[in-house]
Amino acid sequence: MTASPTNGSLAAVGDAPDLSGLPGLDPSWSRMVTVPDREGTPRTWHLLDNGAEPVHGTVLCVHGNPTWSYLWRGLLAAAPPGWRVVAPDHLGMGFSERTGQARRVDQRIDDLGTLTAALGIDGPVVTIGHDWGGIISLGWALAHREQLLGVVLGNTAVAQPAGDHGPPLIRLAHLPGIRPFGCVATPLFVRGTTALSWPALPREVRDALALPYGTADRRKAVGDFVADIPFSPGHRSYDTVAELAEGVRGLDVPTLMFWGPRDPVFGERYLADLRDRLPQARLHRFEGASHLVTEDAPQYADAVAAWLGDLTSVAPDVPLTSTPTNVSEETLWTALERRAQDPSPVMSVAGSVVSWQSMAARVTELAAGMAAAGIRPGDRVGLLIEPSADLTAVVYAAWRAGAVVV
């Protein structure tokens, strides 16, 4: 059970920054703590913490670049009873200490582990990550499997899909001739990130997201984060990220993905790669949302809160995944699974062609959703759906969940 801080290495320090007046943020969530890093050097962190008694567990929120813990304010506000929500600012980011040193992804994962240990977070834990925070959160998850209850991801990536050279916007910012100017000397990268949303975010929200990054000194880690993205072999973090990307395939815990499909950074190829690595994931698309999906679709917080509720309400023997119930080797959906990557048509309805690939993905999503909603093997399910591709998908999903269609 996640506990209140008891570790002697944790020290409360100074006053938290004055965050009063920031839209949607309760200033009482803000706190500063000092924790030794793996070299034993004391490091001062800023974090948001709703302070709830973790009856069910803790949600560990990990932001990306160039955001900060403010990104997660909606989830702190929407958290169901019994869930503690902790959202730290990475070292060098937000209102955490500027260490003066570039920190690689493996160091940031280790930093996060030392922080959670000092905060007394020992499970159950649900990780949630966005942007570069996605792979850091997954790195923490892989290092703390015994504490891990679930994984949530929003518009992120763990690998470059085959044939992909990386997001053009990030590759541009990554160039040695561009990065010092665009990411550090000027707020171009910081302000450009908030400009990806359309309609535009309210000015006060854009200003709040940029608040910790007002000077070049405070933006140094923004450039360091970009420099640490391994686009090719030989990069200092390439092997670490590749190992993490493969390790993710072994995470068999319940998983939720929430996605802004208008993202010019992490498009559909990155989502497809994640779903291939985490096939049990339930997906929520928020149409019209871009890269900052938490801002463009604030209702994501309600979706995550509902999913957290499912984690604690579903019977232990019914996983929140798309894994079939106990069946023989050959099932009613075996043929569909065998052709899950086949783009050829499986059916045509009213001029609309449905591929084997899309049908298999839809059945997987629906089956996981049915299990999460409480459908048990042997349950009788009535369907009020007109003959269509949707009906076919729902029937197969019901069978896969172990239900009987009547």
Language-model features: locations:
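A short N-terminal helical cap/helix-turn-helix that marks the beginning
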Residues: 325-346
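Conserved serine/cysteine hydrolase catalytic core
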Residues: 218-276, 285
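Conserved AMP-binding/adenylate-forming core of the ANL superfamily
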Residues: 38, 44-48, 344-396
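Short hydrophobic alpha-helices that are characteristic scaffold elements of the AMP-binding
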Residues: 396-404
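Catalytic histidine-centered segment of alpha/beta-hydrolase-like enzymes
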Residues: 289-301
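Alpha/beta-hydrolase fold catalytic core
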Residues: 1-59, 80-83, 121, 227, ...
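Conserved HGGG/HGGXW glycine-rich cap/lid loop of the alpha/beta-hydrolase fold
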Residues: 50-95
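Active-site loop/oxyanion-hole signature of alpha/beta-hydrolase fold enzymes
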Residues: 41, 48, 87-129
